C-alpha cells in the first residue's frame, strides 16, 4: 500500500487551556466521518478517565483521518491533539516534532493568553507553519475581529482571513479542513533511504510489550524487519506496524517516510525505549540520529511512599511503566524514618504530580502517601563543594553552609486592567521582582515578574485566579539560581522529628509558616490518650507550638462520694499512666497531615 507523500498532512492543534482544542479535534473527526455518530463522544481523543473528569488533555493523542477535499483529491491527515497546561509543555514539544504544521486555536471571547504565546513560540522553534483559527464565535461575548487584530499585533501572524468557527456547534469546520490542505506543507523524506524514525511517545501493552509511536522521516519499515534504538542500542524484530484509528490501533503492511504510526516489536524491557530516540534498521542503519527533544528537568520533587510497605516493588513497577508513557517523570529510591521505603520523584509541576499520583492509584491500584513537594536548591558549602538538594531532610548542618541559592522563574501574567493592582500585590507578597508591564490593548496588560519557584509551586495559581476573578492567565519558564536567605523548618510531633514534614522556607517567613503549620497539624492529628505537643523548630530553636489535648477516661465514675484521698489516688495513678504512655506511645499521623503543608496559605 503505497501512499503519495504529497497527500499527507501531519499537524497538531495548539491553544491555551480551555480554548477548545479537543472539541475542534472531535468536530474534525466527526465531519470527516472517521467515526460513526454512535461512536462519537465528547473529547474522543482524551481516552483516560482522568482527562474526561477534569476536562483537560494530559497525553498527546494521534489519529489518522481521511478527507476528500473540494478539489476532489483524497488527503490523509495525521492529527495530534496536545495538552495546554504549562506542566505538560514537554508533551506539546514532543508532538510538534512529529508534525509539519500547527493549527492555533484562539478563543473569540478571551483572546490571546499567556500559554497561547508560549505554545506558538514552541511551534515556531520547530519551524512549523502555524495558521490561526478563531473559536467560540457563537458566544454572546465573542469579539472575533478584535481577537484577529490581537493575534496579528501580539503574535505577529496573519489572522484577518482566519476561519471563524464554533467547534461546539460545528460552524465553518469545512473552512478549517480546506485550510489544512492549503497551508500545511506535505512531508518530505526519501522512502528508499535507510530507516530514520523519531519516537514521540510510547505505551505499554501487557500482550505486545512496549508499543512505540513514531514519525518516519526517511525509509520504511514492515513486519519482520529488525529495528534498533540508536540511544540504547537495543534491537528487536518488528511484529506489527500500523497507524492510529480513533481510539484503536489499525495494522497495515508497511510504514514509509512522512507517515505517523506505531511499531510493536515485543519489547519487554521498559528501559530500552526512550522518547526522543531514533529508530533505524539493524542491517541498514542511518548515519546519525535525529535531534531528539531537549531533556526536561523536573522542577518539583516529592516523596511517594506505599501506605503498605510490602507494596514497594509494585510501586517501582508502576513507576517504570508510567515512565515509558511519560518521559518527564524521574524517580529514585529513598527511605524515610516516618514512612519507610519509597521513591523521590521529580515532576514538572504540581498538576503533573497530582495526575501521576491519581494514575498510580487508579491504574495500578496503589495506596500512596505523598510528602510535601520541594524544589531543587543549590547549597554552597564552606569546603567549596556545591550540592543539589532535592530532599529537605538531607540538608547539611548550617555550620557547613556558606550560602544557598534557589531557582527563579520568569513569569508572564496576562490580566485585565481592573486587576493589575491585585496581581502586582500578590507577586510582591511572593517575593517577586518586578520586570516590566505593557498594555496589549486598552483593557489588558502583560506583566513580567521574576519569582522564586518555591513560592509558585504550592498555590500561586489558585491565588492568581481568585484575585483576578479568573481573568488572569499565567505562563513561566525557568530562569536561573539566585542567592537567598533560606532555613530548614523541622516539625516535631511528640518531641520526635518527622523527616517527611520538614521543608525549606525563606528566613523571614519561617515563624509565620511554622505557626500556621502547627495549627494545621493540630486539626489533622487525631486525639490520643495522651497529650501530643506539635512544635516547629529552626536549627534546634522551637519557634511555634500547639498541643493536641488528651482524651481522658473518667476514672472517678466508680466513686460515689467517699474520701477525697481515694479520688486523688486514682487521678495521680491516671497521670502516671499518661506520662508513661507519652514516652512509649506512637502517634498515628494521617496522610492529610503530610499534604496540609501545601494548603497553608488558603485560610
Curated annotation (Swiss-Prot):
Reaction it catalyzes: GTP + H2O = GDP + phosphate + H(+)
GO MF, one annotated term: ribosome binding
Entry EC no(s): 3.6.5.n1
A biological process term (GO) from this entry: positive regulation of translation
Coiled coil: none
Topology class, membrane: Peripheral membrane protein
One of the Pfam families matching this protein, by short name: EFG_C
Keywords, in A-Z order: Cell membrane, GTP-binding, Hydrolase, Membrane, Nucleotide-binding, Protein biosynthesis
EC top class, as a word: hydrolase
Domain tr-type G span(s) in chain numbering: 6-188
Entry GO terms, CC: plasma membrane
UniProt main location, coarse: membrane
Its job: Required for accurate and efficient protein synthesis under certain stress conditions. May act as a fidelity factor of the translation reaction, by catalyzing a one-codon backward translocation of tRNAs on improperly translocated ribosomes. Back-translocation proceeds from a post-translocation (POST) complex to a pre-translocation (PRE) complex, thus giving elongation factor G a second chance to translocate the tRNAs correctly. Binds to ribosomes in a GTP-dependent manner.
NCBIfam families: lepA, small_GTP
Family: Belongs to the TRAFAC class translation factor GTPase superfamily. Classic translation factor GTPase family. LepA subfamily.
Record-given protein name: Elongation factor 4
Amino acid at each position: 500500500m503505497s501512499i503519495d507523500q504529497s497527500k499527507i498532512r501531519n499537524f497538531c492543534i495548539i491553544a491555551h487551556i480551555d480554548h477548545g482544542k479537543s472539541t475542534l479535534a472531535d468536530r474534525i473527526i466527526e465531519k470527516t466521518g472517521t467515526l460513526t455518530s454512535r461512536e462519537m463522544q465528547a473529547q474522543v481523543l482524551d481516552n483516560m478517565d482522568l482527562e474526561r473528569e477534569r476536562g483537560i488533555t494530559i497525553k498527546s493523542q494521534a489519529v489518522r483521518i481521511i478527507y476528500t477535499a473540494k478539489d476532489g483529491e483524497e488527503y490523509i491527515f495525521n492529527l495530534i491533539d496536545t495538552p495546554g497546561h504549562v506542566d505538560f509543555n514537554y508533551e506539546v514539544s514532543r508532538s510538534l516534532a512529529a508534525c509539519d504544521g500547527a493549527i492555533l486555536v484562539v478563543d473569540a471571547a478571551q483572546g490571546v493568553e499567556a500559554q497561547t504565546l508560549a505554545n506558538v513560540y514552541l511551534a515556531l522553534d520547530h519551524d512549523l507553519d502555524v495558521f490561526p483559527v478563531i473559536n467560540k464565535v457563537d458566544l454572546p461575548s465573542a469579539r472575533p475581529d478584535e481577537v484577529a487584530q490581537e493575534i496579528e499585533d501580539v503574535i505577529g501572524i496573519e489572522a484577518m482571513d482566519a476561519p471563524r468557527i464554533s467547534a461546539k456547534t460545528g460552524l465553518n469546520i469545512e473552512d478549517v479542513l480546506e485550510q489544512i490542505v492549503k497551508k500545511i506543507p506535505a512531508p518530505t523524506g526519501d522512502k528508499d533511504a535507510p530507516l530514520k524514525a523519531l519516537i514521540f511517545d510510547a505505551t505499554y501493552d501487557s500482550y505486545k510489550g512496549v508499543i512505540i509511536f513514531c514519525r518516519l522521516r526517511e525509509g520504511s519499515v514492515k513486519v519482520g524487519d529488525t529495528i534498533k534504538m540508536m540511544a540504547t542500542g537495543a534491537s528487536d524484530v518488528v511484529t506489527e506496524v500500523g497507524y492510529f484509528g480513533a481510539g484503536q490501533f489499525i495494522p497495515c503492511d508497511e510504514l514509509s517516510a512522512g507517515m505517523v504510526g506505531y511499531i510493536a516489536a515485543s519489547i519487554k524491557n521498559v528501559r530500552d525505549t526512550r522518547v526522543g530516540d531514533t529508530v533505524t534498521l539493524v542491517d541498514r542503519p542511518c548515519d546519525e540520529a535525529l535531534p531528539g527533544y531537549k531533556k526536561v528537568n523536573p522542577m518539583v520533587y516529592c516523596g511517594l511512599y506505599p501506605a503498605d510497605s510490602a507494596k514497594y516493588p509494585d510501586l517501582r513497577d508502576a513507576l517504570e511503566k508510567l515512565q515509558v508513557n511519560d518521559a518527564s517523570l524521574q524517580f529514585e529510591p529513598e527511605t524515610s524514618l516516618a514512612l519507610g521505603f519509597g521513591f523521590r520523584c521529580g515532576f514538572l509541576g504540581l498538576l503533573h504530580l497530582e495526575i501521576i499520583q491519581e494514575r498510580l492509584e487508579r491504574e495500578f491500584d496503589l495506596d500512596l502517601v505523598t510528602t510535601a513537594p520541594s524544589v531543587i536548591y543549590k547549597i554552597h558549602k564552606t569546603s567549596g563543594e556545591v550540592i543539589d538538594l532535592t530532599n529537605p531532610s538531607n540538608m547539611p548542618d548550617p555550620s557547613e553552609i556558606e550560602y544557598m541559592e534557589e531557582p527563579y522563574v520568569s513569569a508572564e501574567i496576562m490580566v485585565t486592567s481592573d486587576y493589575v493592582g491585585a496581581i502586582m500585590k500578590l507577586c510582591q507578597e511572593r517575593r517577586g521582582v518586578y520586570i516590566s508591564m505593557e498594555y496589549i490593548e486598552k483593557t489588558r496588560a502583560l506583566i513580567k515578574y521574576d519569582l522564586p519557584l518555591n513560592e509558585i509551586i504550592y498555590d500561586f495559581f489558585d491565588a492568581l485566579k481568585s484575585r483576578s476573578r479568573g481573568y488572569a492567565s499565567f505562563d513561566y519558564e525557568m530562569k536561573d539560581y539566585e542567592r537567598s536567605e533560606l532555613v530548614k523548618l523541622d516539625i516535631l510531633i511528640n518531641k520526635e522529628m518527622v523527616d517527611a514534614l520538614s521543608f525549606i522556607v525563606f528566613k523571614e517567613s519561617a515563624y509565620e509558616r511554622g505557626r500556621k503549620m502547627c495549627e494545621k497539624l493540630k486539626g489533622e492529628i487525631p486525639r490520643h490518650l495522651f497529650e501530643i505537643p506539635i512544635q516547629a523548630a529552626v536549627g534546634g530553636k522551637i519557634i511555634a507550638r500547639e498541643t493536641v489535648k488528651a482524651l481522658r477516661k473518667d476514672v472517678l465514675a466508680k466513686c460515689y462520694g467517699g474520701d477525697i484521698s481515694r479520688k486523688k489516688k486514682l487521678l495521680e495513678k491516671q497521670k502516671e499512666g499518661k506520662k508513661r504512655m507519652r514516652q512509649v506511645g506512637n502517634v498515628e499521623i494521617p496522610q492529610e497531615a503530610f499534604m496540609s503543608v501545601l494548603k497553608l496559605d488558603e485560610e
